[in-house]
Amino acid sequence: MPQHLTAEHYLDTALEALATGDVCPSVLDKLPVPIYTTDEAGAVTYWNRACVDFAGREPTLGEDHWCVTWQIYTTSGDRLPHHKCPMAQAIREERSIRGSVAIAMRPDGTRRAFTPYPTPLFDDDGKLIGAVNMLVDVSAEQAQVLADQAKRCRRLADATYDRQTCGVLSNMAEQFAATAEQLAL
């Protein structure tokens, strides 16, 4: 089954469990993907064991905000503050956020690429009460994309006669290759 269909299935299972009140530890703890919830202010209120395995740390309920990961980076390597992550955006805009990829850095320095599925939760009156997020590990796919980018940059560097352009492309190739290697660990 394609990964996005599996992800959507797990998310639907989590949303159904939350809607029926059958939350901890029964349904969500059994899911093999990281799932966590926050209140309307972004404070983490629940996480399953897969979150710890993915993030390399145990989130602190009520203290961690927006995400269960230690640090987040964009795919271009820029630090993404937690208050600007897709989960924060979903709560702020009161809508589901789809289609992004981010890099989680664990406390031990290892990195995992992931696709988040932040989805706001509303009470029966339509008032925002929090959000649920599922993190799908896409490290292998992202490592391959970055390795391919490194190869392209090297080919372009080899084909150009401008020393400065060659240097920039070679540097980009090294950065792409290094990040791909980190994700492949």
Model-found features: residue ranges?
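Terminal output helix/cap of sensory domains in signal transduction proteins
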Residues: P59-D108
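PAS-family sensory modules
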Residues: M1-V33, R92-R95, V132-V145
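Conserved hydrophobic beta-strand signature of PAS-family and PAS-like sensory domains
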Residues: I35, V44-T45
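Sensory-domain boundary capping and coupling elements
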Residues: P116-P118, I129-L135
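PAS/PAS-like sensory domains across diverse signaling proteins
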Residues: A41-A43, D53
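N-terminal capping loop/helix in small sensory signaling domains highlighted by a polar->aromatic N-x2-3-F motif
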Residues: N48-C51
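Sensor-regulatory modules in signal-transduction proteins
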Residues: L121-D123
